[in-house]
């Protein structure tokens, strides 16, 4: 049961960070969303909000990075799958929930959030760069193309949330597909 409560709190924190950002999410919000009893906060996270934030972002980042690292898709397919995931998520949440890593990295996020987010982005970048080099793209171009894809998709997520439309993300996905196709041809 304790593990279930802890996991529910982490999952709720990630969802709330995606929706509100790290700074605008309180312990009370996480408790309400997870249904966890008030006394469970410091039982599961004795380091307080810093620990909750750090672990939640590390968990979210680890999930995304692991999907990239385990992928047997080529680089173009990896990028397309990443964009399509957020298209579905934006539609599912009525544009309320974006990327938890971005939420942690921006808006004055503290080191307990920004550090794990930076690590996850680095893992994603590394996995995509590796896929590109295995497909014959030389460095430093492979690294640049990975940066372009991650930056473009993250920016398109912001635009899509702002406009309440997946069009920016779809346009970005299509342009990245063309760029990657020309490089990988």
Give residue ranges: language-model regions.
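N-terminal intrinsically disordered/low-complexity leader segments
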Residues: 1-3
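Helix-turn-helix
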Residues: 8, 12-55
